[in-house]
Amino acid sequence: PYEALRERADEVRAREKGEHVFVRGLIEFSNRCERNCRYCGLRSANPSLKRYRLDEAQIVEAAERAVAFGVDTLVLQSGEVHDEPQRIAHVVDALRTRFPVAVTLSVGEQPTASYALWKEAGASRFLLKHETADASLYAALHPGYTLAQRVDALQRLRRAGYEIGSGFIVGVPGQRPE
């Protein structure tokens, strides 16, 4: 049964996506974060983390190297901050203007207006993990936030027209098999 499933999955993959292997290049442009998620090294309460934020020239330089290596998608990632929507839009626009690649954002939950601004600037995809479907575990992992808020953010991203990447953390303490 496994071999038949694998063969069928390969047929569907070839029909839907073709033979090209998409290569994504991740640029972590900042490790600043306003949240204090219990599992994350970027959490705001981590006193040993030296914070940084790349400027636009550094991001473009990293993107240039990534594209030269054959990257199809640039993933711009940071912790969650809400003080720079215009800056992110400007960087997305600069990358889309300069390079023939897709731009994916991974910058946490944001206001709907920011999602729209970045979409207009040229971002086409957004990564926003929900980590668990258990509301009480989500609240324990993300102090001050709820699973309903995360689901709402995912729905707002969908309405804004993004392709969305999401998912779980497998093996997080407190997780149950169901």
Show where each model-derived region lies.
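Short, intrinsically disordered, charge-balanced linker/junction segments flanking boundaries
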Residues: 175-178
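Short, solvent-exposed polar/charged micro-motifs at secondary-structure junctions
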Residues: 3-4, 31-35, 115-116
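Canonical Radical SAM [4Fe-4S] cluster-binding loop centered on the CxxxCxxC motif
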Residues: 17-58
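Generic alpha-helical structural signal
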Residues: 3-10, 60, 89, 151
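Solvent-exposed, flexible loop/coil residues
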Residues: 25, 31-33, 141-145, 173
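Core AdoMet radical
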Residues: 44-61, 65-87, 94-154, 160-170
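An N-cap/entry alpha-helix motif that binds or orients negatively charged groups
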Residues: 1-22
